[in-house]
């Protein structure tokens, strides 16, 4: 069924809104993936706060024009699935990477973060970004280890001073 001009404008506006509020985007080719598996992916995406849409290439090019994701324009060939992460930059990359492991026909083309194009081979850089809570926990552990280490060194210096006396 052909889309009318108003339908196309609505799709471009919807994808553009998602792009403006997104932290990162991932582009993939979903040819050969069953409807049941795609439905499962969409459900997992909703739970992870990821916006997923299969869009015509000309429409998605217009939608991302003027956003941080314009660098992805060259990857819009063939059937295009685009996923935007709005809560955490690595959410879409992590979700699609895990899905690609289970579905051999699903292929990640590229990703974008802060206006930088990330090739499919380097998608791990984005997928392995810690969440805010994980980063905060790592920072607190670093502070805790630093203060504990300083305390141990102080005790060792005190012991050495008493032994020398």
Curated annotation (Swiss-Prot):
Tagged with keyword Ribonucleoprotein: yes
What GO molecular function annotations does the UniProt record carry, in alphabetical order? large ribosomal subunit rRNA binding; structural constituent of ribosome
| Gene3D superfamilies, A to Z | 3.30.70.1730, 6.10.250.2350
Which superkingdom is the protein from? Bacteria
User: One Pfam family name from the record?
Assistant: Ribosomal_L10
One Gene Ontology biological process: translation
- Choose one Gene Ontology CC annotation of this protein and give it: large ribosomal subunit
**Xref: PROSITE patterns:** RIBOSOMAL_L10 (PS01109)
Name the InterPro entries on file.
Ribosomal_uL10 (IPR001790), Ribosomal_uL10-like_sf (IPR043141), Ribosomal_uL10_bac (IPR022973), Ribosomal_uL10_bac_type (IPR047865), Ribosomal_uL10_CS_bac (IPR002363)
Q: Can you list the disulfide-bonded cysteine pairs?
A: none
Q: Which CDD domains match?
A: Ribosomal_L10
Q: Which UniProt keywords apply?
A: Ribonucleoprotein, Ribosomal protein, RNA-binding, rRNA-binding
The record's subunit annotation is: Part of the ribosomal stalk of the 50S ribosomal subunit. The N-terminus interacts with L11 and the large rRNA to form the base of the stalk. The C-terminus forms an elongated spine to which L12 dimers bind in a sequential fashion forming a multimeric L10(L12)X complex.
The family this protein is said to belong to: Belongs to the universal ribosomal protein uL10 family.
- Show the HAMAP family listed in the entry: Ribosomal_uL10
Give the protein's function: Forms part of the ribosomal stalk, playing a central role in the interaction of the ribosome with GTP-bound translation factors.
Q: What is this protein called?
A: Large ribosomal subunit protein uL10
Native organism is Shewanella pealeana (strain ATCC 700345 / ANG-SQ1)
Classification of source organism: Bacteria, Pseudomonadati, Pseudomonadota, Gammaproteobacteria, Alteromonadales
């Amino acid at each position: 069924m052909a889309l009318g001009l108003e339908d196309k404008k609505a799709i471009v506006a919807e994808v553009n809104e998602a792009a403006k509020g997104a932290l990162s985007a991932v582009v993939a080719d979903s040819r050969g993936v069953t409807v049941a598996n795609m439905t499962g992916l969409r459900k997992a995406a909703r739970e992870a706060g990821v916006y997923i849409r299969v869009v015509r290439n000309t429409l998605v090019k217009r939608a991302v024009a003027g956003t941080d994701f314009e660098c992805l324009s060259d990857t819009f060939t063939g059937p295009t699935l685009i996923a935007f992460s709005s809560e955490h930059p690595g959410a879409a990359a992590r979700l699609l990477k895990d899905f690609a492991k289970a579905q051999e026909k699903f292929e990640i083309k590229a990703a974008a973060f802060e206006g930088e194009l990330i090739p499919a081979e380097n998608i791990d850089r984005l997928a392995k970004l810690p969440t805010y809570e994980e980063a905060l926990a790592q920072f607190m552990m670093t502070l805790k280890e630093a203060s504990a280490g300083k305390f141990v060194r102080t005790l060792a210096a005190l012991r050495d001073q008493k032994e020398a006396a």
